[in-house]
Amino acid sequence: MIAIIAEKPSVGQDIARVVGATEKMDGYITGNGYMVTWALGHLVSLALPGTYGYTRTTAEDLPMIPEPFRLVPRQIRTDRGMVTDIAAGKQLKIIDEVFSKCDSIIVATDAGREGELIFRWIYSYLGYTKPFRRLWISSLTDEAIREGMANLREGSGYDSLYAAADSRAKADWLVGMNASRALATASGSANNSIGRVQTPTLAMICARFKENRNFVSTPYWQLHIALKKDDVHRQFFHPEDFRDKNGAEAAYRRITSDSVVTINKVERKTVFQQAPLLYDLTALQKDCNIHHDLSADKTLSIAQSLYEKKLVSYPRTGSRYIPEDVMAHVPALLEKVITMPWFREYGRTFDLSGLNTRSVDATKVTDHHALIVTGVVPEGLSEAEAVVYEMIAGRMLEAFSPRCEKESLKMECVCEGMDFRSQSAVIVNPGWRAVFSRKEDREKDEPEGNGGTAVFAEGEEIPVMGYGLAQKKTLPRPLYTEATLLTAMENCGKEIADGQAREAVKELGIGTPATRAAIITTLFKRDYIERSGKSIRPTEKGLYLYESVKGMMVADAELTGTWEKALAQIEGHTLDPESFMLSIREYTGKVTGEILRLKFPEPSSRAFTCPKCKTGNVIVKAKVAKCDHEGCGLLVFRRFLNKELTDQHLEQLFSSGSTRLIKGVKGKKGASFDAAVAFDADVNLKLSFPKPKGGKGK
């Protein structure tokens, strides 16, 4: 018998059907010489500090460096603390039973770092040494599964992939556990957590927020003239802004004495805008956030669902290219795409015989090629699934369409010795831009005036029809959205305009395409950041943590980027995992020491009278606040729904009976709203909503 292990039940069932295993058992399917089982995501994890004897950590215990790390069944948080997940424990026993009855194993977990880690940790925890081979496929269609089963790869070929995943997990444990406990020790509060990747990301968000909030706007003035001849009129702008009002007004008075100007330069040329590359996960997440307001995590979840429905290729890819052998299938795929309702209009003129090959480059393909559709006809999709599928299919059409051809026009004139310029462009042949024909794309090309690219002649004298002096003001860089934050994570916070330079720095980015959404989601879940419209801003709790660690190594985005590069080198066989772990241990020691040296103000000695018994005092601890009077029983958990009650929240609650308005509270059904947390008549926590403004309409 041969065991096959997938990452989740739905994938296991698909594989079982293809290989002819039909007899369903508890946790696996058997038949035709196969036993197909599955994980439920990460069934095994690294043990928590308590397993190593670190229960009440003091400064002397830090840093905690387990030697060796231990693996345990997945743990979940309960009122009794962390306990083994019953479902995980049960499935591990089933996998153990399946493996014990088989001679060899086929690994069919997702073909990437996390998928490899899921299997290897199960394999190691259960103590197996049986040979295994890898099913490495980029889609879950029956054809792809059959082809993959016919071309299984040796498991040892993925040892470096496992080493990178294992090293990343251990690095995250070392930095996160030690830094968080160091901060708790230094501050006397266990209400904050620090992560190797999450904290630099939070630091970028907080730094941008503070820069935006503290920005002092300054005025400046722009000078322009309006020229008109027949039906053609253009606005010409002076190329330099005026920072001084008196100077701007003097220049304005000067030019108003000139009623005719001479056009001294006319430059018209054809320019081409390249078709965009195919999507990798991050590019898809950015566009879905920009155009459809989908979060990075939601986009990933939908893309994963489309993958499991066999509609798109593996979504957690970091490549925007495909190799030549995949390109051979593209014409047939596009032939199906242009029959879909979204693209029928564009498909009428689309030429399948001369496809753009900019996205074809095997040297730039990593573990998986770019995101493409599989050709399976989409049916029964939810509204959100249809949106993401349309984005992926539409990007395929864009990527293989001709370049966009524009006609660019630049004109210059002199008015009273001052230069003025006009610049515009019109689309001659939209090429790829006709796929979606987005309004914002068209607006970028509207000329300053009218008349298309009709021009004044060089040397021609044109009457001035108007003069303008517009006062404007400098604006701060905007708060991050999820789309711009993903770009910042790719570039380690650097503002990089040049495309080639941006590609080069990607290997130094924060996180990977597969993990960035989870990093952002973690910051939301831990109440460090919140949404304000489409923007992201830090919470009071997030700003407090940022102010505590800013300038430290643990908040340094570029330093975190070097660790990501090192993990990629492990995967690429150019760095020894043990060398990486040695460096991480040293880094952990430095980070821990840095945090332990922090000086925090003494906790407020203000005591709150218990609102329940009116006799005892409320003692505020890391996870609860409770009355010290025997028999009272007042107990307030700091975690309420999805929010962590900060010290300020508790002070408001015990002083006035209610906190101020807290943004982004999530109810039990997942709906998000703004509400205060207050005491009810029995001194239990409840939600309190602001009264609506104004009276009722008639």
Predicted regions and their residues:
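Accessory interaction regions appended to the cores of large information-processing enzymes
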Residues: R17-E23, W38, A47-L48, Y54-R56, ...
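Intrinsically disordered, low-complexity regulatory segments
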Residues: M1-A169, W173-V175, F350, P476
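C-terminal or mid-to-C-terminal helical accessory/interaction module adjacent to the motor/catalytic core
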Residues: A87, K93, S100-K101, L140-L227, ...
